[in-house]
Swiss-Prot record:
One of its GO terms (biological process) is cytosolic ribosome assembly. Coiled coil: none annotated. Interacts with ribosomal protein uL14 (rplN). Pfam families: RsfS (PF02410). The keyword Cytoplasm applies. The keyword Magnesium does not apply. This is Ribosomal silencing factor RsfS. HAMAP family: Iojap_RsfS. GO terms for cellular component: cytoplasm. Functions as a ribosomal silencing factor. Interacts with ribosomal protein uL14 (rplN), blocking formation of intersubunit bridge B8. Prevents association of the 30S and 50S ribosomal subunits and the formation of functional ribosomes, thus repressing translation. InterPro entries: Iojap/RsfS/C7orf30, NT_sf.
Amino acid sequence: MPAPSSPRKNQTSFDPEMLLKLVTDSLDDDQALEIATIPLAGKSSIADYMVIASGRSSRQVTAMAQKLADRIKAATGYVSKIEGLPAADWVLLDAGDIIIHLFRPEVRSFYNLERMWGFGDESDQPVSQSVLS
């Protein structure tokens, strides 16, 4: 009997950095606000990267999440798991190697995930999307 594959990893050869670029480009195309990328490799087994972004409204957050899931599936064949769409205050997409959090601005400020995952080291601070380009 074959060993079960990791549920987190996608089954394609899509590189995590290429997936990260796809995610940040998609969010930028959809006019997401304050896109932040947090490298998790070596710090957490949940993913290689966490991406956090805001939308101006629940409607924009919903649209960004759905478009992003469609783009990831088209590029990699991976079906992202999505949580939080009914209210769309905070939507989480699990894209395998990347976890994406999409917020309305006031909800993002309340939870402050960037600070929680900052780990207190200058080198561990989130990288803004403009630095990645």
